[in-house]
Amino acid sequence: MASRFMTDPHAMRDMAGRFEVHAQTVEDEARRMWASAQNISGAGWSGMAEATSLDTMTQMNQAFRNIVNMLHGVRDGLVRDANNYEQQEQASQQILSS
């Protein structure tokens, strides 16, 4: 018996919402981490140690930004694909009913 793949646009949009929540969580945590790093940056650190710490934190902040962008890309793709599926389904229904 052949299996059939069923697409559920509503479930796709629900999952897109979850990706948005994950993206917001990553963004919030990255912001907290950056603020914490800024607070300890001047606490007894100077010269090369402070510059290295700031460079590391800047790289980590960019990495988190990349993760957020990827999560948003998945979210956008799910919504786009759900919309496309619904449009194609409606077009198919119109063709079949005529």
Curated annotation (Swiss-Prot):
Keywords: Secreted. Induction: Differentially expressed under different growth conditions. It is found in: Secreted. Pfam families: WXG100 (PF06013). Its main location: secreted. Disruption phenotype: EsxJI deletion mutant shows extremely slow growth in broth cultures. GO terms for cellular component: extracellular region; peptidoglycan-based cell wall; plasma membrane. Belongs to the WXG100 family. CFP-10 subfamily. This is ESAT-6-like protein EsxJ. The lineage of its organism: Bacteria, Bacillati, Actinomycetota, Actinomycetes, Mycobacteriales. The gene is esxJ.
